[in-house]
């Protein structure tokens, strides 16, 4: 019998090459030969690229080019010629096999290996696979056996066929599914996935969805494909600096993130295995979280993401009326709304905050309710759930305390209702508390300055208290100063424990807190030195005093013009000045070491050599005008930086030309080059900040507002909470739908004629509306020349609202709710829908 073996490559399109060798005639043709040892020139197995410590290449999903690999399992075929040795005969006689084993005209059975199957499915050649089922049944094998899978990636012939579609189809897919069904391995075969670390978990259903093929998706689901299979390989994870596509791992999320609404509806509504709309991936993200993750703030992307988000939300409400899909959090404790805020997806954030659904059965999904409209002016109620600071991981906290690298951080605070909510908090209580704190801090610094100025100077500390009025005032001032230092110290500790800023964002986002904390440290060190009878306490005290007056700039954020100026100073110190100082110190140290090497004390070129009584170098030589030390030379070179240097500050050197060249080079690099670069960089920083100065100032004020709220007790936070508890309709189970809402009056001259509606009679005839409108009128926002710049208009409009072409009725009369509400202070807001109509 002839034994054939071929080098296997899963991607090759050429027929296998065979090498024959003699085999004993009595050997079973179906027996499995021993494994072939790998060739010494075969390539190593590929593993993932981006794992820790990995350096190998990442393999593609499918490639038509051949790559060296291990030898495949040998192919066993029936030879057409047999060599038989009989007793008594002479030399071995050769005769045709048809005389003993195979009848004339009968074809030998077709045998398959991984390579032959892969080649057939890649070419969509069903004829090559006609004998596959008899072969598997005869050999008692299945397509899910390891010998029919890629040893490196775990790819099966079904996955190979899904990756090689011709005009959107591959005829071998149905054939392979039928073969797997008849070999009792259909479910395992359909759900077989990649096993390598890069594409781990990807199944045929994922590929069919990615190929946007509804027919194949239906075929796979009908045959038992797992609609909850998770593709969690490295390629499907979101890691900074790594190429890949994160879509939420699940097939439903993949269909949603690739904008395939038909497949989304099929996965949720099919009768074979409906997908779980609330399923979460390995990081706890649902399909809504995944949609937020794939948003990139471009117009087209935002439009498709918000549209898909809206469709899934409505579909989920119809399939599972009591499920609160938007309230599901991931492992970081973030809802889709909070995730949009933390990642800077301003378009998605604006859509969610301003979503208004008019369908009666889905109106409970709205976060915005239009209360009344009159011309271009309309009053809206915004749901404050997940927005206000009363809840954990609220949108306001996420935006205000996010990293400075978060995109659109400043602009997100201008989206309604965030902009008006912060303004309401500032006007109602934060402004008064902030100004009071400013007054107290000024008083504290005055007392601290007086206590430091009138400190005793005779003797060693601690000083005895004299029975004089001045000493009593001094000691009282010292006690108050130390108490303030202790307060700022523990406040800084509390801040760092709560926020836990990273080292990268520590100096950028926590600039003011660090300065107050350092001020308190200097004060506490001064106290320790004072009671240790060390007069050095004065040095630490004056540093604390200087930083205390500098930190008064923190309170300029309560005033727009001064707040912007303080922001510019902070940015220039952190960005421009730090970089300048690093380069300048390198130049200063380098040229100082060069100059001090040339200087020799006692060496004077203008005097004879006999007049130099001695030569010395280093710290041991201390004449009156010695420059033979690094410290004194650095001071002299620093004078050159500010234009006060003298090229002949010493003559104790040899090689005068070299000395002058060093000084001139230093002056050119520092005084002419570096200082002018610093001025240019500062000018650029000022221009950048000036363009968005108001937004930056609003962010600083927002942080101040939230810090003030956090300083309250829980009972006080509820008392100062913005908005009111209102009834906005009914829940899906027929109960009253109470929301904590905040009223915002808006003006829109663009679409006002398509949104004319009067929800309440006598628009504006309520206390809250009067208060809001009167505030706007007092601010001059609606009067005369400022009407077009009415500040009630949100910066970002809901994409679904812009695309809605259906006009509404000009006047909508809604029924009044006459029943009693459980919350006594709740205002009633209902639409025309009654519970029986739902």
Curated annotation (Swiss-Prot):
Effect of mutating residue 704 to I: Loss of activation by capsaicin and loss of vanilloid binding
Region span, Required for PIP2-mediated channel inhibition: 777-792
Sequence motif: Selectivity filter, positions: 643-646
Topology in the lipid bilayer: Multi-pass membrane protein
Binding locations of Ca(2+): 646
Region: Interaction with calmodulin, residue numbers: 767-801
Pfam family, one: Ank
Superkingdom field: Eukaryota
Result for mutant: residue 511 to A: Loss of sensitivity to capsaicin
Residue positions binding ATP: 115, 155, 160, 164, 199-202, 210-211
Effect of mutating residue 636 to Q: Slight modification of pore attributes
Effect of residue 199 to A: Strongly reduces affinity for ATP
GO MF annotation list: ATP binding; calcium channel activity; calmodulin binding; chloride channel regulator activity; excitatory extracellular ligand-gated monoatomic ion channel activity; extracellular ligand-gated monoatomic ion channel activity; identical protein binding; intracellularly gated calcium channel activity
Tissue specificity comment: Predominantly expressed in trigeminal and dorsal root sensory ganglia. Expressed also in hippocampus, cortex, cerebellum, olfactory bulb, mesencephalon and hindbrain. High expression in the cell bodies and dendrites of neurons in the hippocampus and in the cortex. In the brain detected also in astrocytes and pericytes (at protein level). Isoform 1 and isoform 3 are expressed in brain and peripheral blood mononuclear cells.
PTM comment: Phosphorylation by PKA reverses capsaicin-induced dephosphorylation at multiple sites, probably including Ser-116 as a major phosphorylation site. Phosphorylation by CAMKII seems to regulate binding to vanilloids. Phosphorylated and modulated by PRKCE, PRKCM and probably PRKCZ. Dephosphorylation by calcineurin seems to lead to receptor desensitization and phosphorylation by CAMKII recovers activity.
Activity control note: Channel activity is activated via the interaction with PIRT and phosphatidylinositol 4,5-bisphosphate (PIP2). Both PIRT and PIP2 are required to activate channel activity. The channel is sensitized by ATP binding. Repeated stimulation with capsaicin gives rise to progressively smaller responses, due to desensitization. This desensitization is triggered by the influx of calcium ions and is inhibited by elevated ATP levels. Ca(2+) and CALM displace ATP from its binding site and trigger a conformation change that leads to a closed, desensitized channel.
Catalytic activity: Ca(2+)(in) = Ca(2+)(out); Mg(2+)(in) = Mg(2+)(out); Na(+)(in) = Na(+)(out); K(+)(in) = K(+)(out)
Modified residues (Phosphoserine): 116, 502, 774, 800, 820
Effect the entry attributes to changing residue 788 to Q: Strongly reduces CALM-binding and abolishes PLC-mediated channel activity
Other comment: Responses evoked by capsaicin, but not by low pH and heat, can be antagonized by capsazepine.
Record note on quaternary structure: Homotetramer. Interacts with PIRT. May also form a heteromeric channel with TRPV3. Interacts with CALM, PRKCM and CSK. Interacts with PRKCG and NTRK1, probably by forming a trimeric complex. Interacts with the Scolopendra mutilans RhTx toxin. Interacts with the spider Tau-theraphotoxin-Hs1a. Interacts with TMEM100. Interacts with PACS2.
Domain statement: The association domain (AD) is necessary for self-association.
PANTHER family in the record: TRANSIENT RECEPTOR POTENTIAL CATION CHANNEL SUBFAMILY V MEMBER 1, TRANSIENT RECEPTOR POTENTIAL ION CHANNEL PROTEIN
Protein's UniProt name: Transient receptor potential cation channel subfamily V member 1
Organism this protein belongs to: Rattus norvegicus
């Amino acid at each position: 019998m002839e034994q054939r073996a071929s080098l296997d490559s899963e991607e090759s399109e050429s027929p296998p090459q065979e090498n024959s060798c003699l085999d004993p005639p009595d050997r079973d043709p179906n027996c499995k030969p021993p494994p072939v040892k790998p060739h010494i020139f075969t390539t190593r197995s590929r593993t993932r690229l981006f794992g820790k410590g990995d350096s190998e290449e990442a393999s593609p999903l499918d490639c038509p080019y051949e790559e060296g690999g291990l030898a495949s399992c040998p192919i066993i075929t029936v030879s057409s010629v047999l060599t038989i040795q009989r007793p008594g005969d002479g030399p071995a006689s050769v005769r045709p096999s048809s005389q003993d084993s195979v009848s004339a005209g009968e074809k030998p059975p077709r045998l398959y290996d991984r390579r032959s199957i892969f080649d057939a499915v890649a070419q969509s050649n069903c004829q090559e696979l006609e004998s596959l089922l008899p072969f598997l049944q005869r050999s008692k094998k299945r397509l899910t056996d390891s010998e029919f899978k890629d040893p490196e990636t775990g790819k099966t012939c079904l996955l190979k066929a899904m990756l090689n579609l011709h005009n959107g189809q591959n005829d071998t897919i149905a054939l392979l599914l039928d073969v797997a069904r008849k070999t009792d391995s259909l479910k395992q075969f359909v759900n077989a996935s990649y096993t390598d670390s890069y594409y781990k978990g990807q199944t045929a259903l994922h590929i069919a969805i990615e190929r946007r093929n509804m027919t194949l998706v239906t075929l796979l689901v009908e045959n038992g494909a797992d609609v909850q299979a998770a593709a969690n390989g490295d390629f499907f994870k979101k890691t900074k600096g790594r190429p890949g596509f994160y879509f939420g791992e699940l097939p439903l999320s993949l269909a949603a993130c690739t904008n395939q609404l038909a497949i989304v509806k099929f996965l949720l509504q099919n009768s074979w295995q409906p997908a779980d709309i609330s399923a979460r991936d390995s990081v706890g993200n649902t399909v809504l979280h995944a949609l937020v993750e794939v948003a990139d703030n471009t117009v087209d992307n935002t439009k498709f993401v918000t549209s898909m988000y809206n469709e899934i939300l409505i579909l989920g409400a119809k399939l599972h009326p009591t499920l609160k899909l938007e309230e599901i959090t991931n492992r970081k404790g973030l809802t889709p709304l909070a995730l949009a805020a933390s990642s800077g997806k301003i378009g998605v954030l604006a859509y969610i905050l301003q979503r208004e659904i008019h369908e009666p059965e889905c109106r409970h999904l709205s976060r915005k309710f239009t209360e009344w409209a009159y011309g271009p002016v309309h009053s809206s109620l915004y749901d404050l759930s997940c927005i206000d600071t009363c809840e954990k991981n609220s949108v306001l906290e996420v935006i205000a305390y996010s990293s400075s690298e978060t995109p659109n951080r400043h602009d997100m605070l201008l989206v309604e209702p965030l902009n008006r909510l912060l303004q309401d908090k500032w006007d109602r209580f934060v402004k008064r508390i902030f100004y009071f704190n400013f007054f107290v801090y000024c008083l504290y610094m005055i007392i601290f300055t007086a206590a430091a100025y009138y400190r005793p100077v005779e003797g060693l500390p601690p000083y005895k208290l004299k029975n004089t009025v001045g000493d009593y005032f001094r000691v009282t001032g010292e006690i108050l100063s130390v108490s303030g230092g202790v307060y700022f110290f523990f406040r800084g500790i509390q801040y760092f424990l709560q926020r836990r800023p990273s080292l990268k964002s520590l100096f950028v986002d926590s600039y003011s807190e660090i300065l107050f904390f350092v001020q308190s440290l200097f004060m506490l060190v001064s106290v320790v030195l004072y009671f240790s009878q060390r007069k050095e306490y004065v040095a630490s005290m004056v540093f604390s005093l200087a930083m205390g007056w500098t930190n008064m700039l923190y309170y300029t954020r309560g005033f727009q013009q001064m707040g912007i100026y303080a922001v510019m100073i902070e940015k220039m110190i952190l960005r421009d000045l730090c970089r300048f100082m690093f380069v300048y110190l390198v130049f200063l140290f380098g040229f100082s070491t060069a100059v001090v090497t040339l200087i020799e004390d006692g060496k004077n070129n203008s005097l004879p050599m006999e007049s130099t009584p001695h030569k010395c170098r280093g710290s041991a030589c201390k004449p009156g005008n010695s420059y033979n030390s690094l410290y004194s030379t650095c001071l002299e070179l620093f004078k050159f930086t500010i234009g006060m240097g003298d090229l002949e500050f010493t003559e104790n050197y040899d090689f005068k030309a070299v000395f002058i060249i060093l000084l001139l080079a230093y002056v050119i690099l520092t005084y002419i080059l570096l200082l002018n670069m610093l001025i240019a960089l500062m000018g650029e920083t000022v221009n950048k900040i000036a363009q968005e100065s108001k937004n930056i100032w609003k962010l600083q004020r927002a942080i101040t507002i939230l810090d003030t709220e956090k300083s309250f007790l829980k009972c006080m936070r509820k008392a100062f909470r913005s908005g009111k508890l209102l009834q906005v309709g009914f829940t899906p189970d027929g109960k009253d739908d109470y929301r904590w809402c905040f009223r915002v009056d808006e003006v829109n001259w663009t679409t006002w004629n398509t949104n004319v509606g009067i929800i309440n009679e006598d628009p504006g005839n309520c206390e809250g509306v009067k208060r809001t409108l009167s505030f706007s009128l007092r601010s001059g926002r609606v009067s005369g020349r400022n009407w077009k710049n009415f500040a009630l208009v949100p910066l970002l409009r809901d994409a679904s609202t812009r695309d809605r072409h259906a006009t509404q009725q000009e006047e909508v009369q809604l029924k009044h709710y006459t029943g009693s509400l459980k919350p006594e202070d709740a205002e009633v807001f209902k639409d025309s829908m009654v519970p029986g109509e739902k």
